[in-house]
């Protein structure tokens, strides 16, 4: 597939599925966050994710998430809504200036995966990733992210990803990538180019000093309907 161009981003990782990272670790529970929209407030809540306005809206389309001004409080769709059985199996990120591969992660083939007891399986397992980067990552200007994914027995029309990055609920950058059409039962590979936004020295220092307060939502759409939602947070201190 073609190389696609986007806006900005960052990465190192701890996860159970492909994503921007240098190391792989178990998924980490997502902490509670603020409301999904800067324009609609939510009541105070106890422990756990807070419901937001978009969680009560179906279906959710691209324009809905493009209006979000802060990280979502919870996932906006269930794993069961991925009726196309889209499965990301490999992820690689490289510095476009030097060509250096910053990290690569790959799922083992289905035949090599350990059997699981579905009754004990967290329904959100694999949807959250924790990334650990060095401070130097914040000074990169452009990276290429190669993703390999498979689809099930349904055709995938107008496959699109919108990824929004925040620091302390301030929007840093929004990326919008179009994968296009994927034929049924296919394996697909493409590289997206992330142009990172310029960051002030003050903001870089704050992002380094406050690990995991940089967060992102990744929304995946088929025919303008949300079918997958992944989350991540980031540390740029170079340590877990």
Curated annotation (Swiss-Prot):
GO terms for biological process: chemical synaptic transmission; endocytosis; lipoprotein transport; mitotic cytokinesis; negative regulation of caveolin-mediated endocytosis; negative regulation of clathrin-dependent endocytosis; nervous system development; phototransduction. Abundantly expressed in retina, in photoreceptor synapses and inner segments. Expressed in a much lesser extent in several other tissues. GO terms for molecular function: lipid binding. One of its GO terms (cellular component) is spindle midzone. It is found in: Cytoplasm, Cytoskeleton, Microtubule organizing center, Centrosome; Cytoplasm, Cytoskeleton, Spindle pole; Cytoplasm, Cytoskeleton, Spindle. Phosphorylation suppresses its interaction with KLHL18 and down-regulates its KLHL18-mediated degradation. Phosphorylated more under light conditions than dark conditions. Dephosphorylated by calcineurin. Keywords: Cone-rod dystrophy, Cytoplasm, Cytoskeleton, Disease variant, Endocytosis, Lipid-binding, Phosphoprotein, Protein transport, Sensory transduction, Transport, Vision. InterPro entries: Ig_E-set (IPR014756), PDE6D_unc-119_myristoyl-bd (IPR051519), PDED_dom (IPR008015), PDED_dom_sf (IPR037036). Involved in synaptic functions in photoreceptor cells, the signal transduction in immune cells as a Src family kinase activator, endosome recycling, the uptake of bacteria and endocytosis, protein trafficking in sensory neurons and as lipid-binding chaperone with specificity for a diverse subset of myristoylated proteins. Specifically binds the myristoyl moiety of a subset of N-terminally myristoylated proteins and is required for their localization. Binds myristoylated GNAT1 and is required for G-protein localization and trafficking in sensory neurons. Adopts an immunoglobulin-like beta-sandwich fold forming a hydrophobic cavity that captures N-terminally myristoylated target peptides. Phe residues within the hydrophobic beta sandwich are required for myristate binding. Residues 1-59 are annotated as: Required for midbody localization. Residues 121-240 are annotated as: Required for centrosome localization. Residues 1-61 are annotated as: Disordered. Interacts with CABP4; in the absence of calcium. Interacts with DNM1; leading to a decrease of DNM1 GTPase activity. May interact with GTP-bound ARL1. Interacts with ARL2 and ARL3 (GTP-bound forms); this promotes the release of myyristoylated cargo proteins. Found in a complex with ARL3, RP2 and UNC119; RP2 induces hydrolysis of GTP ARL3 in the complex, leading to the release of UNC119. Interacts with NPHP3 (when myristoylated). Interacts with CYS1 (when myristoylated). Interacts with MACIR; interaction only takes place when UNC119 is not liganded with myristoylated proteins. The keyword Nucleotide-binding does not apply. It is linked to Immunodeficiency 13: A rare and heterogeneous syndrome defined by a reproducible reduction in the CD4 T-lymphocyte count (less than 300 cells per microliter or less than 20% of total T-cells) in the absence of HIV infection or other known causes of immunodeficiency. IMD13 predisposes to infections and malignancy. This is Protein unc-119 homolog A. Residues 1-11 have a biased composition (Gly residues). It comes from Homo sapiens. Tetradecanoate binds at residue 131. Belongs to the PDE6D/unc-119 family. The modification Phosphoserine is found at residues 37, 39, 41.
């Amino acid at each position: 597939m073609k190389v696609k161009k986007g806006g900005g981003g960052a990465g190192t990782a701890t996860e159970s599925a492909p994503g921007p990272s240098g190391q792989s670790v178990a998924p980490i529970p997502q902490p509670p966050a603020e409301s999904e929209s800067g324009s609609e407030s939510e009541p105070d809540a106890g422990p756990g994710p807070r419901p937001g306005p978009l969680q009560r809206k179906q279906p959710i389309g691209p324009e809905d998430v493009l209006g979000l001004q802060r990280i979502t409080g919870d996932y906006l769709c269930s794993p069961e809504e991925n009726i196309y059985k889209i499965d990301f199996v490999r992820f690689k990120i490289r510095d476009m200036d030097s060509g250096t591969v910053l990290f690569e992660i790959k799922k083992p083939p289905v035949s090599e995966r350990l059997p699981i007891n579905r009754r004990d399986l967290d329904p959100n397992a694999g949807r959250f990733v924790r990334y650990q980067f060095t401070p130097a990552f914040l000074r990169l200007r452009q990276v290429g992210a190669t993703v390999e994914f498979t689809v099930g027995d349904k055709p995938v029309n107008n496959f699109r990803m919108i990824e929004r990055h925040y620091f302390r609920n301030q929007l840093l950058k929004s990326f919008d990538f179009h994968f296009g059409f994927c034929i049924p039962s296919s394996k697909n590979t493409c590289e997206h180019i992330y142009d990172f936004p310029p960051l002030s020295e003050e903001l870089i220092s704050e992002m380094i000093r406050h690990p995991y307060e940089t967060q992102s939502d990744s929304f995946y759409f088929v025919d303008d309907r949300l079918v997958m939602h992944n989350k991540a947070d980031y540390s740029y201190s170079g340590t877990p």
